[in-house]
């Protein structure tokens, strides 16, 4: 027989279900936002690598009097993990194109044009 003065402690089933429902709602909000943060980080990584590769292209030109068509030969430049860079260059200009598999349909293209003095970086959805 139970002692009427002793009260049992603990959570009811309803209280536990309410807590589980609240956690589920918070997870449903947070998980898609986390994916968006990751994609923005990948996009920033591509843009940064394109700018850094362009700076390295200019350093390469100062040494060789031509631009490199191989991103791996650029002095002092190492691309970030996951970033795909394509460099094309000749004696007068270069183009660098960057993508990342974590940011589908996004591409950055850095185009130099020393004759006009207006190099530009264009990053956009493809």
Name these PLM-found stretches.
Residues 1-11:
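N-terminal leader/signal peptides at the extreme start of proteins
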Residues 9, 43, 52-55, 61-62:
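Extended, polar beta-sheet/loop recognition surfaces of beta-rich domains
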Residues 14-33:
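Alpha-helical hydrophobic helix detector
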Residues 15, 44-47, 69:
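Compositionally biased non-globular segments, especially hydrophobic aliphatic-rich helices
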Residues 20, 47, 54:
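Conserved catalytic core of two-component sensor histidine kinases
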Residues 30, 37, 57:
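Conserved alpha-helical elements of the SDR catalytic core
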Residues 33-50:
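Aliphatic-rich helix starts adjacent to a transmembrane/signal segment
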Residues 55-126:
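Periplasmic/extracellular, small/polar-rich flexible segments of pilin-like filament-forming proteins
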């Amino acid at each position: 027989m139970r002692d009427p003065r002793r009260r049992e402690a603990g959570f009811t089933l309803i209280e536990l279900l309410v807590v589980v429902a609240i956690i589920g709602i918070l997870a449903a909000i947070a998980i898609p936002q986390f994916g968006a943060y990751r994609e923005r980080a990948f996009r920033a990584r591509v843009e940064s690598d394109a700018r850094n590769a362009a700076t390295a292209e200019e350093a390469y030109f100062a040494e060789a009097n031509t631009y490199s068509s191989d991103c791996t030969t650029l002095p002092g430049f190492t691309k970030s993990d996951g970033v795909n860079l394509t460099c094309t260059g000749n004696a007068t200009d270069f183009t660098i194109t960057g993508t990342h598999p974590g940011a589908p349909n996004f591409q950055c293209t850095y185009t130099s044009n020393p004759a006009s003095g207006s190099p530009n970086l264009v990053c956009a959805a493809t």
